């Protein structure tokens, strides 16, 4: 009997669990159906198929901006390569090797190809790698990139903002020029790229690739990529999620880093003029893929992936900076219990926190003020006691000096009185002495006269 009751209860529990599970599945299915939009067929033409054309026309009217950061040692060919990439002489003056610090020089140009306008900003690292102490050579570059992110963030946070007219100066790509001399990456190169890989899209290029043979160049490429991977440096990978360009981008990812040669000089090869470098042993054609990877770089950088570089800068690198800055300011997407927070809730919580912090600071300042006042009062009282003691001492000394002077005065007056008495006595005596000789003379004269008679 007991076993039958147990089986009955177990069966009821199983039925209840199964029913609850089925109800949960039905509820989830209904929720998904509720959340997903319904697909409908229109009975006629509406016109929103022209949205892509509208977007293209608006973009062409607005124009585009593209910002390139060139990092590399002085004289490695940064300016020449940029001139060659855009087929323009940007008139950048040669830099000296004797700058005490690394500084960044940004120059903006307006370019137009057909009806497309491009605002191109080229940022050059002047004096990079020229100092004896290269420990902090990468810091000005990091500071510059962060400064551009901060400027864009401040524009975004304005109450009255105008991002449509704002000149976006955020760096979209960093062309990192690697010297072809040596057998591996320099420590400065590793430190710099490691510091920049989370802030900018890095495309490493081997500059002046005509300085080494093809065999050495291939070994050098393999060595560089191995060092980048082993040191955790994240370079820009051409995207493969778009089917139209996935195949060529995947192929080009295998050619990194690009070995490039730049030149604006034209040399006659056969029956045509080509951009090339003329050497005693022959000609290195810039746009010949058998000679260097310049064409690959131009195709990947400008023709195929320029918009992806701009998008990666905004959606990845800038978002990382923005999230970090907002978290430092106290803004969070979720609360303590992983509940979503609105901006108003975050603001109110932060305002309450700041209010409490202000109250605490005010209380601390009051206590500190009272403590300082007490300390000052104690110091003043001690100084007052010292002054009072000094005053009493001086008063006592003055009194003693006064008594001593009065005693001297009394003695002096007594001496004066005694002297006066002596003087008076002396004068009397002198007068008596002066009068006595006269009377005797008269007596003698009278006596003589009597005798004569």
Curated annotation (Swiss-Prot):
Region (G1 motif): 72-79
Chain spans, region Disordered: 18-43, 433-453
Pfam families documented for this protein: Septin
Any one GO CC term of the record: microtubule cytoskeleton
PTM statement from Swiss-Prot or TrEMBL: Proteolytically cleaved in vitro in a calmodulin-dependent manner.
G3 motif: annotated segments: 124-127
Binding site for GTP: 72-79, 127, 208-216, 262, 277
Biased composition (Basic and acidic residues): 27-37, 441-453
Alphabetically ordered keywords of this record: Cell cycle, Cell division, Cell projection, Cilium, Cytoplasm, Cytoskeleton, Flagellum, GTP-binding, Nucleotide-binding
PROSITE patterns: G_SEPTIN
Stretches assigned to the Septin-type G domain: 62-328
Chain intervals for the UniProt region annotation (G4 motif): 207-210
Role: Filament-forming cytoskeletal GTPase. May play a role in cytokinesis (Potential).
Record-stated family: Belongs to the TRAFAC class TrmE-Era-EngA-EngB-Septin-like GTPase superfamily. Septin GTPase family.
Oligomeric and partner information: Septins polymerize into heterooligomeric protein complexes that form filaments, and can associate with cellular membranes, actin filaments and microtubules. GTPase activity is required for filament formation. Interacts with ADGB.
Protein name from the UniProt record: Septin-10
Species in which this protein is naturally found: Bos taurus (Bovine)
Lineage: Eukaryota, Metazoa, Chordata, Craniata, Vertebrata
